[in-house]
């Protein structure tokens, strides 16, 4: 896939970025609650990813903002104005869907120009704007091609150009990469992010892919059962998750039994300080990430090497403690030869674990 060039001369960028606010937003479908009092603010010009498992409410929130779905209560504001009574076609938002949703009987150029045609723009203006946008997404040579003559990645870039044609102040992306193969998905991920930064357009990006959210977004909002668990930068979300759900949904975690001490917890006979709160009761576990676990060969060590998964520069080892707890550790691949399956190791944890949580029921 060709990487899109910088904006062509004359391409009009977004006419000012918008602030988007969800206030106490609720939506139910029968007995199922999709959104349970969502409060979230999207800053002007940022790309915010809505991340969470299926059914968490992320697409419902996007569709309510777009005007394709009604809400039960709460408000959706753009620059302080409640837009929930405004028809979808007047909301100044462009949307890109997972399924591309291109018109099969229209060429790439006519697909991009369709919204302009509906707005009453003249033929010359439509063609000029559509060609500028095709240049922007790197597909001017596909102007007269039809959707069936293009790859999935090319079709999605046409859909993106179409969404930008009316110069919306908010861009909505509903899992736009999930139908693409891995290589094209990675390329288009980088391209969307670059275009978003160049255009300065406020963007909401729905995804269930943690890597996609962390690599593209300025901030990530993690939803669970219609509620906001945490909204933070990717580094903060990964390194300082607010809840055990966030910690385990974003990246890999191991849970290791621990006991409470006066100033922290004790794990495998060693004391550790804890930054966050420690639950007052129940069986406790520390949560640690594989890259923060160290293993060294030790004939009588507490960890039995069970398996290894090659990941390139690192290899992920799974070790089992005497109580049956399994812990994952990422080691440089060249160091793994000293720790074959069946060998024992000494296990060292970070001075401060990511989180302390009650043992799940």
Residues of each region from the PLM?
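Conserved catalytic Walker-motif region of ABC-type ATPase nucleotide-binding domains
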Residues: 15, 22
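The feature captures the beta-strand-to-loop junction immediately N-terminal to the Walker
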Residues: 51-53
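Conserved ABC transporter NBD signature motif
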Residues: 74-82
